[in-house]
């Protein structure tokens, strides 16, 4: 009986790679395994796309909460040495460089990180590491570097130039990002081929801490630990307060599913509230973050607290109201009946996600930390569903799991990175946030996204079997890393040439911007094609 069960398990595992056998598992509804593989593949692809929409929506909530966290200031009381009077100032709690690496990069990369971690937990007890996690993160790194650069370079208006102001911090982040891929190649091919030891996994994770320390040292210009490079002008605020509301984005409903809730909360009788809001994008790509300040005298602390609490509950209540409202205030302003129907249909499509994510508390509670944590939990849940869909797609289509991992799955889970960098390229006066988010996300993907899952598996295998973790397709993964390293050099060289010739990494003459964008996309296609051919055994 045991031999029969083992043979059945082997057949099911082989079906995931070869696609010859029927996949017996079902996920959407009972009896779906009786459908044809082609129909099941279509259903799973649609489900995967719908999950990406959900990831975009919940990431918008994450961005709002993150902005509130970074904007938090602490009161500092000092004594003037001359007048002996108290001087009250407010200083930012977060250093912007650390916030970029630990909050922005970690948050936008959280779908990929959670996918890899969930995959590692599911594979606990297995001597071979799951291929979905590392493949997704390598593909995500390629998507971050090439398509996101391709988008950011054409985002500024025609003739507008946006360059990196702090080249020292960017170079530190870039060097650590390149070293991450070199390090992966060393442990996969040189140090212990096809094996990940506990020491290797631990060293991978610890390098993330070294990145934080080195980047902070460069930002503060610590001697002996920083590059002696001057810093250009940089904005005082991490998120600019000035906005341009003249733009209208048709994709608004994906990234800002709560703007109407906040607006209705303000319009519904809260007349003693002055709204001081900032959005992460001029066209509402990621939604509005509201800061409510009671329009009362400073000494009316009790009234101020009551007004604040009332507004918090009003906004939270209207999040649920907005989730079940098909026609928003913006769609009512549209003259075309067809566009109004399309917008209503889009709201109907988003309604389940909006209703689910309405449980995330408003971002102005506890400086955004509660919403921050809740958003991460929801992202993890959606990421788990994504792993199930990708497993089933690989099973019914016979596509190699690695190919799915660094193409469709990596592109979809990197959508938050694309949104964040695009917004930064639009709103920031410099290119620091847009480009730094790419390099920081890639570093986080490697040191945390690959290091933590491998650390989980190696620790378990060490105590359970006294064995290391084996990599089933190390050559394919190593080949992808080599291709990515080669193409990324071509990307960085073009950015440096744009800096020297045009004067900025982003923007410039429209023709040159579009040519640069096309070149970056070509590099991504080269990476995807060569990596897919390698893991499929063609080359």
UniProtKB/Swiss-Prot annotation:
Keyword Ion transport belongs to the record: yes
Tissue: Mainly expressed in the vascular cylinder.
Annotated localization: Vacuole membrane
Pfam families: Na_Ca_ex
Keyword list, A-Z: Ion transport, Membrane, Transmembrane, Transmembrane helix, Transport, Vacuole
Membership in a protein family: Belongs to the Ca(2+):cation antiporter (CaCA) (TC 2.A.19) family. MHX subfamily.
Protein name: Magnesium/proton exchanger
Lineage of the organism: Eukaryota, Viridiplantae, Streptophyta, Embryophyta, Tracheophyta
Gene name linked to the record: MHX
């Amino acid at each position: 009986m045991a031999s029969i069960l083992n043979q059945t398990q082997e057949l099911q595992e082989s079906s995931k790679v070869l696609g010859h056998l029927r996949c017996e598992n079902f996920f959407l509804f009972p009896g779906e395994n009786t459908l044809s593989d082609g129909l099941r593949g279509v259903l799973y692809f649609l489900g995967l796309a719908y999950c990406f929409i959900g990831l975009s929506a919940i990431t918008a909530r994450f961005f709002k909460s993150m902005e509130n966290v970074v904007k938090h200031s602490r009161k500092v009381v000092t004594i003037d040495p001359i007048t002996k009077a108290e001087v009250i100032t407010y200083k930012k709690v977060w250093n912007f460089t650390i916030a970029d690496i630990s909050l922005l990069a970690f948050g936008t990369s959280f779908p990929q990180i959670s996918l890899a971690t969930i995959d590692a937990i599911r594979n606990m007890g297995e001597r071979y590491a799951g291929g979905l996690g590392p493949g997704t993160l390598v593909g995500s790194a390629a998507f971050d570097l090439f398509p996101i650069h391709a988008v950011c370079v054409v985002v500024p208006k025609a003739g507008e130039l946006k360059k990196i102001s702090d080249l020292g911090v960017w170079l530190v982040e870039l060097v650590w990002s390149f070293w991450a891929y070199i390090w992966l190649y060393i442990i996969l091919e040189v140090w212990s081929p096809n094996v990940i030891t506990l020491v290797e996994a631990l060293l991978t994770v610890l390098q993330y801490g070294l990145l934080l320390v080195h980047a902070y040292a460069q930002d503060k210009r610590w001697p002996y630990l920083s590059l002696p490079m001057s810093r250009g002008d940089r904005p005082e605020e991490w998120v600019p307060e000035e906005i341009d509301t003249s733009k209208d984005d048709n994709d608004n409903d994906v990234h800002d599913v709560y703007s109407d809730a906040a607006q209705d909360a303000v319009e519904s009788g809260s007349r003693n509230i002055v709204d001081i809001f900032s959005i992460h994008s001029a066209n509402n790509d990621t939604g509005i973050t509201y800061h409510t300040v009671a329009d009362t005298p400073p000494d009316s602390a009790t009234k101020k607290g009551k007004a604040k609490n009332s507004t918090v509950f009003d906004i939270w209540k209207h999040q649920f109201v907005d989730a079940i409202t098909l026609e928003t205030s913006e769609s009512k302003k549209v003259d075309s009946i067809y566009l109004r129907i399309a917008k209503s249909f889009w709201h109907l499509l988003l309604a389940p996600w909006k209703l689910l994510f309405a449980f995330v508390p408003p971002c102005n509670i506890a400086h955004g930390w509660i919403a921050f944590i809740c958003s991460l939990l929801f992202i993890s849940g959606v990421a788990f569903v994504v792993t199930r869909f990708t497993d089933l797609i690989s099973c019914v289509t016979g596509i190699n799991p690695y190919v799915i991992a660094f193409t469709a799955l990596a592109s979809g889970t990197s959508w938050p990175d694309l949104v964040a960098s695009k917004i930064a390229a639009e709103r920031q006066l410099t290119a620091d946030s847009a480009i730094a988010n790419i390099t920081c996300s890639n570093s986080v993907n490697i040191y945390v996204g690959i290091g933590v899952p491998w650390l989980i598996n190696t620790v378990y295998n060490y105590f359970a079997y006294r064995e290391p973790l084996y990599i089933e397709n190390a050559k394919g993964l190593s080949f992808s890393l080599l291709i990515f390293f080669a193409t990324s050099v071509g990307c960085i060289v073009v950015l440096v040439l744009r800096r020297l010739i045009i004067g900025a990494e982003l923007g410039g003459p429209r023709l040159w911007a579009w040519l640069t964008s096309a070149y970056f996309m070509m590099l991504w296609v080269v990476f995807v094609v060569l990596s897919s051919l390698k893991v499929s055994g063609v080359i």
